[in-house]
Amino acid sequence: MEKETEAKVLLVDDEQEFLETLSSRLELRGLKVSAVTSGEQAITEAKQQDFDAIIVDLSMPGIDGLETLKRIKADNPNAEIIMLTGHASVQSGIEAMKLGAGDFLQKPVELSELMEKIGEAKDKKMLVLQKQSQEELRKILQSKSW
């Protein structure tokens, strides 16, 4: 991902050390990062702010990653969510993708790969927003009989 556009990212992981390290590394690359340690906090943050990508750990106490994914997608179907896990299984990845995750990566994640996925998520979000704007404009023009 190039530095021309700063992405806004929400990191969700119950492992505090991992969360702090990844946050710092992403911020050094020009991203604006919010970090939380639970699914509950992630759901609240996702309602209050608009993120280009939400990176969620699959295995967390309380509300796990899949439930966090479901609840965020219920509130914001266009949210771009990347799932992370230290215990990846093909079945978990399939389930996350069925629930609307844009991608699924295994820890330890390569920073370059994560940056690429964040860039893709931001690009996809921008395309969705452009399409929605075009559709709204089309409806306005039709209502005015232009």
Residue ranges and their predicted role:
Residues 16-34:
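Two-component/phosphorelay signaling modules centered on CheY-like receiver
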Residues 60:
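Receiver (REC) domain active-site loop signature in two-component systems and cognate sites
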Residues 57:
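Active-site residues of response regulator receiver
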